[in-house]
């Protein structure tokens, strides 16, 4: 059987919030090393990859590998019934067609028990090659969310230009243009407020803002976000999940003609 217990249950609630608007259903691959998920969005433009390592859970047991087909909207609705302070346990038998979700308050005065029907999903796994990137930008996740939201008022695509001294986000539309430039910070006391840039060569790429705004739903999971870019390959937007794993979003750049 499979059983995973998470004292900080709010993490799982935040993970579902980060997934449910982008993908409707996905296969949760459960093994002794942890839980992983990989899925294209419904329009096959972006890809999301989630890893939750077994040692990030407070207790974890998986006797044999399971592939659980989950409707993310249904799972999100059930997780909304859990309080932010609740302890969450996921449980499934080896050949089960349901996933049990148990929510306990810290004093265990209230225990809620839900069973969610699983789906049969035919999922192809895409190999994601390891890449060296021309530019890797690490910045506060709230700042990135704000930039994407603000520039969405101007246009539907953003040009991200990365150079040694800073990274620039630009959008243009019918009402005009907007440019936001972040300089690399030199001496920030708090690491999660810093902007750091590792650059091998300058990059200038255009991305659809509506997808970036979907990705920023993961902001509550991490104080920082990492953007990895190279010409002609998908951007990677990565949010670390403290002591547990990460959620990575992949988005191919737009061709110049489309964006003009």
From Swiss-Prot:
Q: Which Pfam families match?
A: PCNA_C, PCNA_N
Q: Which GO terms describe its molecular function?
A: DNA binding; DNA polymerase processivity factor activity
Q: Which CDD domains match?
A: PCNA (cd00577)
Q: How is it modified after translation?
A: Monoubiquitinated by the ube2b-rad18 complex on Lys-164. Monoubiquitination at Lys-164 also takes place in undamaged proliferating cells, and is mediated by the dcx(dtl) complex, leading to enhance PCNA-dependent translesion DNA synthesis.
Gene Ontology cellular component terms for the protein in this record: PCNA complex; PCNA-p21 complex
Identify the keywords attached in UniProt to this record, alphabetized. Answer: DNA replication, DNA-binding, Isopeptide bond, Nucleus, Ubl conjugation
* Gene Ontology biological-process annotations: leading strand elongation; mismatch repair; regulation of DNA replication; response to activity; response to bacterium; translesion synthesis
Crosslink site: Glycyl lysine isopeptide (Lys-Gly) (interchain with G-Cter in ubiquitin) = 164
**Localization annotation:** Nucleus
Question: Which InterPro entries is this protein grouped with?
Answer: DNA_clamp_sf, Pr_cel_nuc_antig, Pr_cel_nuc_antig_C, Pr_cel_nuc_antig_CS, Pr_cel_nuc_antig_N
Which residues fall under the DNA-binding region feature? 61-80
Q: Which residues cross the membrane?
A: none
Q: What is its main location?
A: nucleus
Q: NCBIfam families this protein is in?
A: pcna
Task performed by this protein = This protein is an auxiliary protein of DNA polymerase delta and is involved in the control of eukaryotic DNA replication by increasing the polymerase's processibility during elongation of the leading strand.
Name the family: Belongs to the PCNA family.
Q: How does it assemble?
A: Homotrimer. Forms a complex with activator 1 heteropentamer in the presence of ATP. Component of the replisome complex.
Name this protein carries in UniProt: Proliferating cell nuclear antigen
Organism the protein comes from = Haplochromis burtoni
């Amino acid at each position: 059987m499979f059983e995973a217990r998470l004292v900080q249950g709010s993490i799982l609630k935040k993970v579902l919030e980060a997934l449910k608007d982008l993908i409707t259903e996905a296969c949760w691959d459960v093994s002794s090393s942890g839980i992983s998920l990989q899925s294209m969005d419904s329009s096959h433009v972006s890809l999301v990859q989630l890893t939750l390592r077994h040692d990030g859970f407070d207790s974890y047991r998986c006797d044999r590998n399971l592939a659980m087909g989950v409707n993310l909207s249904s799972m999100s609705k059930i997780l909304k019934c859990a309080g932010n302070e609740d302890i969450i346990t996921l449980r499934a038998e080896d050949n089960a067609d349901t996933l049990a979700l148990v929510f306990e308050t810290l004093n265990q005065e209230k225990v809620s028990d839900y069973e969610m029907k699983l789906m049969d999903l035919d999922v192809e796994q895409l190999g994601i090659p390891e890449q060296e990137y021309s530019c890797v930008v690490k910045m506060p996740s709230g700042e990135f969310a704000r930039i994407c939201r603000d520039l969405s008022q101007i246009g539907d695509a953003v040009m991200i230009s990365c150079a040694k001294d800073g990274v620039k986000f630009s959008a243009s539309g019918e009402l005009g243009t907007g440019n936001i430039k972040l300089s690399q910070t030199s001496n920030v006391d708090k690491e999660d407020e810093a902007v750091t840039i590792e650059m091998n060569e300058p990059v200038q790429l255009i991305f659809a803002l509506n997808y970036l705004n979907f990705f920023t739903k993961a902001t509550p999971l991490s104080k920082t976000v990492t953007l990895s870019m190279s010409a002609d390959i998908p951007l990677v937007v990565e949010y670390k999940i403290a002591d547990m794993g990460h959620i990575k979003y992949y988005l191919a750049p737009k061709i110049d003609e489309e964006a003009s």
